[in-house]
Design a protein with these regions (language model features):
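Nucleotide-sugar donor phosphate/pyrophosphate-binding loop at the beta->alpha transition
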Residues: 98-100, 109-128
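Donor nucleotide-sugar binding/catalytic pocket of nucleotide-sugar-dependent glycosyltransferases
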Residues: 124-172
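Aromatic "clamp/platform" in nucleotide-sugar-dependent glycosyltransferases that forms part
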Residues: 254
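Short hydrophobic beta-strand element within catalytic cores of glycosyltransferases
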Residues: 271-274, 281, 285
């Protein structure tokens, strides 16, 4: 297939969306597909309001059209609901080219956290964006069911994986963490209000808390929590070494659709502590023994009392965590992605996709 992928999230951004797309593009190319990326790198950009680390393409409509016309894709995957995503969507509808979308991020919830408005205020925009796609790709069945309840029933599963060549036990400890007195509790991800970091940083546990990542709240949290080690963003082997240097991975977010860092941490032999909410529940299962209690040993602790979850996770077997984390492979995830796009290419559009949009 000739596959175009339009995304507002791409390097140098550091997040699960970018890592998921990068691994998928690599896998698709290895399978012989022709892949064209449309990313903010191709446009003039401006900082996202309130989040200068993320840059949004300025007026990408015409550049997106030119790129898609030149590439002539069989099918388009639109990964994000930003300016590039909307531009690619408009091109597909105008040309009659089938497209899929992805629901990576709970933008209504994030917007609610940042604005104080109800998340329901933002859902009509999400429904409009996704309604005409041939399929909405989601990381978990639970998320698909949630979208169906909101009037978007045409979802397909696109799970996530880990790069097993990178994320595995046995890496040498990261010097910045190895020098700390243990136990070490680690968070990896954006340092932003929607990640609920104070819930972790305020926990009264003995040991040292380490935060890996960048974001708009970094300076404020560094000042507010002087005893916490903030290491900034880490990549590649340095990130894997950070996982291997800790005793517990703490994931305080209540709004993630999945949590790629959770399975990376597990694959490195790091038990997980989190809230029993979508994302962690979909990875760890209600009992912390994996999806459908597939593991004989517990690999994570889910509890509304995050302090209790951390203390329980500290007692878990790192080897069991590593075995379970390694079960998440990109090969299977890319099979699902590829199947969804093939089905989109050959399927008849849904009734909502055939309905003309009002200007």
């Amino acid at each position: 297939m000739r596959i175009a992928i339009a995304t507002d999230a791409w390097h140098p951004q550091v997040n699960g969306v970018v890592r998921s797309l990068a691994m998928t593009v690599t896998q698709l190319a290895e399978r012989g597909h022709a892949v064209e990326l449309i990313t903010p790198e191709q446009f003039r950009t401006v900082p996202m309001p309130g989040y200068k680390e993320i840059r949004l393409a300025m007026v990408p409509r015409f550049g997106t059209r030119r790129s898609l016309d030149a590439f002539a894709p069989d099918v388009v995957h639109i990964a994000t609901e930003g300016p590039i995503g909307w531009s690619a969507r408009g091109w597909c509808l105008a040309r009659g080219i089938p497209f899929t979308t992805a629901f990576h991020t709970r933008f209504p919830d994030y917007a609610a956290v940042r604005t104080g408005l109800s998340a329901e205020r933002f859902w009509p925009v999400m429904r409009r964006f996704h309604a005409k796609s041939r399929a909405i790709l989601v990381a978990t069945p639970a998320l698909g069911a949630e979208l169906a309840e909101r009037g978007l029933p045409h979802w397909r599963l696109w799970s996530r994986g880990v790069d097993r060549s990178l994320f595995h036990p046995g890496h040498a400890p990261l010097p910045e963490i190895a020098a700390l007195p243990g136990p070490v509790y680690l968070y990896v991800g954006r340092v932003a209000v929607e990640k609920n970091l104070p819930a972790f940083l305020d926990t009264p546990v003995c040991g040292v808390k380490v935060v890996v990542g960048d974001g708009p709240d970094l300076a404020e949290l560094r000042e507010r929590y002087p005893d916490v080690r903030f290491l900034g963003a880490l990549h590649g082997e340095a990130l894997a070494r950070a996982y291997c240097s800790a005793n517990v991975f703490v994931f305080p977010s209540r709004t993630d659709t999945f949590g790629l860092v959770v399975i990376e941490a597990l694959a490195c032999g790091l038990p997980v502590a989190a809230y029993p909410v979508p994302g962690p529940l979909d990875i760890l299962g209600a009992n912390g023994r994996g999806i459908g209690d597939c593991m004989p040993a517990t690999v994570g602790a889910l509890d509304e009392d995050l302090t209790r979850a951390i203390r329980r996770a500290k007692q878990l077997d790192p080897l069991a965590a590593a075995v379970y984390g390694a079960s998440f492979g990109w090969e299977c995830a890319t099979d699902q992605f590829e199947t969804a796009l093939r089905q989109a290419l050959h399927a008849e559009p849904s009734a909502s996709a055939r309905t003309p949009e009002l200007a």
